[in-house]
A protein has these predicted regions:
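C-terminal binding/interaction regions
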Residues: 1-35, 84-154
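Glycine/charged-rich beta-loop-alpha catalytic/anionic-binding loops adjacent to active sites
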Residues: 53-62, 91-98
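Compact, glycine-rich, soluble single-domain proteins
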Residues: 60-74
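Alpha-helix C-terminal capping segments
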Residues: 50, 78-86
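Short beta-strand scaffold segments in enzyme catalytic cores
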Residues: 42-51
């Protein structure tokens, strides 16, 4: 038997250390949390993504009693894909809000969202992932970094 160690590089920033482009996405993601419909979890997730063509899309999680809701990340991703099919996603910012404040630690996307974004990376274009907490912000170079043992071929 052999053992393999898998690591992921995460860069940690404060808001003031971000580029203006990254700040814009974080601000839009924070605003998007207020569009969340989350009466069951009371956990609002907002996302903002930028395409390579400069277009920006926002999304917020939408719940329902059947638990077949959609996450904020995928809401933004699918809206962008419907309007601009084939245009690569450059970066996405994600943040969460609960109990009347933004979460302290950055929130990572669920497995379904990770897989969805990986599908959009199949064109060989990594998507920068910005996870914004109240003060701390994590940045990853690609969604592949969130799922090192992922599958993208069927």
């Amino acid at each position: 038997m052999t053992e393999k160690k898998i690591t992921t590089k995460v860069r940690v920033y404060s808001y003031n250390e971000l580029t203006e482009e990254q700040k814009k996405l974080v601000d839009l993601a924070r605003e998007a949390t207020m569009n969340s419909y989350s009466p069951y979890s009371n956990f609002k997730v907002g996302a903002a993504l930028e395409l390579d063509n400069g277009e920006v899309f926002i999304g917020a999680n939408q719940e329902n009693a059947a638990f077949a809701g959609i996450c904020g990340e995928r809401a933004a991703l699918y809206a962008a894909g419907a309007k601009y099919p084939g245009v690569p996603v450059k970066s996405v910012a994600i943040t969460s809000f609960t109990r009347d404040e933004f979460v302290v630690e950055p929130t990572a996307p669920c497995g379904v969202c990770r897989q969805a974004f990986l599908e959009f990376e199949k064109n060989g274009h990594p998507i920068e992932l910005i996870l914004a907490g109240k003060e701390k912000i994590y940045i990853l170079d690609s969604f592949q970094d969130t799922m090192p043992l992922s599958f993208t071929e069927f």
